[in-house]
From Swiss-Prot:
One Gene Ontology CC term in the entry: ribosome
Similarity-based family: Belongs to the universal ribosomal protein uL24 family.
Keywords: Ribonucleoprotein, Ribosomal protein, RNA-binding, rRNA-binding
Native source species: Roseiflexus castenholzii (strain DSM 13941 / HLO8)
Assembly behavior: Part of the 50S ribosomal subunit.
InterPro entries, per database record: KOW (IPR005824), Rib_uL2_dom2 (IPR014722), Ribosomal_uL24 (IPR003256), Ribosomal_uL24_CS (IPR005825), Ribosomal_uL24_KOW (IPR041988), Translation_prot_SH3-like_sf (IPR008991)
The protein's name: Large ribosomal subunit protein uL24
Length: 110
């Protein structure tokens, strides 16, 4: 996936189009992310004992990763990302793979 937990993203489609938020949770197997405070849905929950009462609860629903765009921390614009290998190596001796902003060519992962 082109985004990770903690990244700031822009929603590009749907009811929250144009809003920004931080990724709270990522689900790589489902290709979905949960963005803080966005894509709010109402769930009708059944009571689950004295500690969890029932009722209508608002919660954040997952969004497909194709509907979000990473906001570059360097230039502040929503842009596409790419991957490249650095000269330095990781702990296993392989070249380090990092994401970069295609708009300003800055490395996102340090």
């Amino acid at each position: 996936m082109h985004v990770k937990t903690g990244d700031e993203v822009l929603i590009i489609t749907g009811k929250d189009r144009g809003k920004r938020g931080k990724i709270k949770e990522s689900r790589p197997k489902e290709q979905r992310v949960i963005v803080e405070g966005l894509n709010i849905v109402k769930r009708h929950m059944k009571p689950r004992g004295p500690t969890r009462p029932g009722g209508i609860i608002e919660m954040e629903a997952p969004i497909h990763v194709s509907n979000v765009m990473l906001i570059c921390p360097k230039c502040g614009r929503a842009s596409r990302t790419g991957h490249r290998f650095l000269e330095e190596t990781d702990h296993k001796g392989r070249p380090k793979k990092v994401r970069y902003c295609k708009a300003c060519d800055a490395v996102i992962d340090e």
